[in-house]
């Protein structure tokens, strides 16, 4: 199964069976997590075979059952000068030689604490507000980009997945994850063997999700990228993103108003790159150029 097929196959599955995931598949996922951490600077961790990988915590949306396996998407707000939100290589803030990012944390070992004033996890009240801090925005987009990469890899391996936000994850008594100073759990990925098939997927029209210069026919590669982006997961299927093709062939993408919009944008950008072909995509650095992404006709 290639990535485009995995995008079509992927559905949000919130109920799982007790069938364990094969060890060979888990090893592949761990290797993919290590690669994502190395490229992105995130601190993604995985646990398997628990009675409840969500530790009894409430989820921000949806009811989950039988979640024995999960991936914690962990990071800290991106510092000035770091790579853009989809996490180019060279931003790793952790020493892979001195830690095992994908191992299950020992509950008997004290978890690193977070400095005063830094939240360890998103809370519902804060989640309903649009992120405005550039470092937080970059973190959310990066989590979306690399989290969706992992979700699609799991689908390729024959598993089902679903994104989830755990309310009050910082209050868990015996967390299997380890937070370094300043880090937070941004999202979770549940995965395993689904107990039931996924439902129908809905999407906005492509014309509402992208813009191209006046008088230009939409290039095939851009259309393919948009068709892939339209399959990306977003909270409540809101699709709060807008892609713009500029006259010079560069592409910009922005989060619109919506719940967890920047995480959804990261997912959509990963899909877009896969669909369009990474060799065809040149992202516009609007911050550096001082030009607005909305200038589709510039």
Predicted regions and their residues:
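Acidic, surface-exposed loops and disordered segments
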Residues: 1-298
């Amino acid at each position: 199964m290639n990535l485009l097929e995995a995008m079509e196959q992927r559905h949000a599955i919130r109920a799982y069976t007790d069938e364990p995931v094969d060890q060979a598949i888990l090893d592949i996922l761990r290797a993919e997590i290590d690669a994502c951490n190395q490229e992105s600077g995130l601190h993604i961790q995985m646990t398997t075979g628990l009675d409840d990988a969500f530790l009894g915590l409430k989820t921000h949306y949806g009811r989950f059952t039988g979640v024995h396996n999960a991936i914690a998407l962990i990071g800290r707000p991106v510092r000035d000068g770091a790579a853009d939100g989809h996490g180019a290589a060279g931003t790793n803030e952790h020493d892979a030689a001195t830690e095992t990012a994908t191992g299950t944390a020992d509950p008997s070992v004290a978890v690193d604490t977070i400095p005063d004033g830094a939240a360890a996890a998103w809370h519902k009240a804060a989640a309903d507000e649009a992120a405005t801090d550039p470092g937080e925005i970059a973190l959310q987009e990066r989590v979306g980009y690399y989290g969706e990469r992992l979700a699609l890899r799991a689908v390729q391996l024959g598993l089902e997945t679903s994104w989830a936000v755990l309310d009050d994850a910082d209050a868990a008594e015996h967390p299997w994850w380890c937070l370094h100073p300043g880090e937070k759990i941004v999202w979770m990925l549940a995965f395993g063997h689904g107990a039931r098939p996924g439902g129908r997927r809905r999407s906005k029209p492509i014309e509402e999700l992208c813009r191209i210069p006046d008088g230009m026919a939409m290039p095939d590669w851009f259309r393919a990228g948009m068709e892939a982006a339209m399959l990306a997961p977003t909270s409540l299927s809101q699709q709060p993103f807008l892609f713009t093709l500029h006259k010079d062939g560069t592409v910009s993408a922005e989060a619109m108003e919506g719940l967890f919009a920047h995480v959804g944008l990261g997912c959509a950008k990963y899909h877009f790159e896969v669909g369009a072909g990474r060799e065809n995509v040149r992202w516009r650095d609007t911050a550096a150029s001082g030009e607005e992404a909305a200038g589709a006709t510039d």
